Amino acid sequence: MRRKRIAAIVTEYRRWSHADVILRNLLDGYPDGGRPGMELVSLYTDQVPKNDMSRDLAKKHGFSICSTIAEALTLGGNKLAVDGVLSIGEHGHYPQNAKGQILYPRRRFFAEICAVFARTGQSVPVFNDKHLAATWEDAHWMYEQARKLMVPMLAGSSIPVTWRKPDLTLPIGCELEGAIQVGYGPLEGYGFHALEGLQCMIERRRLPEKGTEQGVVAVTCHFGKEMWQRFDQFPWAKRLLDAVLPLIRYHAGGDIRQVSPRAEDAAIFEVEYRDGLRAFVVIPNGWLYENEGGSFYFAALRRGAAQPDVCQFYLQQPDPFAHFAELTKAIDHMMQTNHPPYPVERTLLTTGVLDAAMTSRHEKGRRQLTPHLQDIRYKASDWKHAQGPIPAAIRKKSER
């Protein structure tokens, strides 16, 4: 069977960039020895740093380096010449807005991709790495453009498809009293990963309209001296955090509630769902830090359960970054079937929540009403996260 021809539109292509850890699976195959049904035929790089890898890889693997996005999709002709597009707008040097959001050119990438679709009268599946865009306005525009042009679209983080320790999938229709997600890192860049971890779990809860997610009514970012005050008002939240803490192996000394508020980029996102569920995303920077498997943890309390459900979203890193192979498998499924393995609406929602959280922080913790997020509706997918053995990390001597 012919492999699907793929154009990749990336901000930059250097070692360990998202372009590298995703596209390596198309060029060299998966860590388990398998290969996706895709081949990279063209590449557009928005920036070319001194440590760029793409030019040497193009010589080795035979894909074309293109000077425009349109050229990457048409290979210089008048017709669409690819079966799918990977838009990887992550890493590189781009400005920030006043709220601290990095203005990666994800909307511009998608607009130029869609311009080719409109001109040629053809659309193919598009994967958008991470959140759709920094701002809700841009994200919603992209979503509506995809619907208008009937573009099969997948987006988001590798967190929902990575390994879980212990393996945990909440049963469809379970009743939740509350949920928390613990994460680390830059509030926007890694806060998004934490939100994706939260959402991929709690979207399986019992919902009034036959299992259909109904969206979010308000978001608040708590930080500084007030960081833990709201969280500690809910006994179930403390119980869930107490269940997570034994899983965390790598952290600073001292009490999490005393240490984390001192960090400038530590915060807790409070997410209020339309059906009444409340969840917290805890980012205790200064206390929690990255090490083996990353540091993303989920906990939820099911109604009537004796103990909370708890797991770590385990990231295999550094090389071969096998969790990105799992994300590539989800992308490949869409390219082969024209159907995303899980709804892009999940990431539309997490994008909107993240933007609201960043706005709340910019406005000194003001609660943000989110009427625009109340009508994002979708049903949870049965796409399975990573199973089986986790590949061993490969380290150069200098990295050991």
Give, region by region, the residue ranges found by the protein language model:
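N-terminal Rossmann-like dinucleotide-binding module
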Residues: M1-K60, A179
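NAD(P)-dinucleotide binding in Rossmann-like oxidoreductases
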Residues: H251-R346, K397
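Short amphipathic alpha-helix with an adjacent loop that forms part of the alpha/beta core around
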Residues: A72-L80, D167-L170
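C-terminal helix-rich "cap/oligomerization" subdomain common to oxidoreductases
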Residues: R2, G100-I102, H333-R400
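N-terminal Rossmann-like NAD(P) cofactor-binding module of classical short-chain dehydrogenase/reductase
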Residues: V82-G89
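Short acidic-hydrophobic, aromatic-tinged amphipathic segments that line or gate anion-handling sites
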Residues: F63-L73
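Beta-strand-loop-alpha-helix segment that lines the small-molecule cofactor/substrate pocket
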Residues: E90-P160
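Rossmann-like dinucleotide-binding domain that binds NAD(P)(H)
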Residues: A179-L277, I283-E290, L349-G352
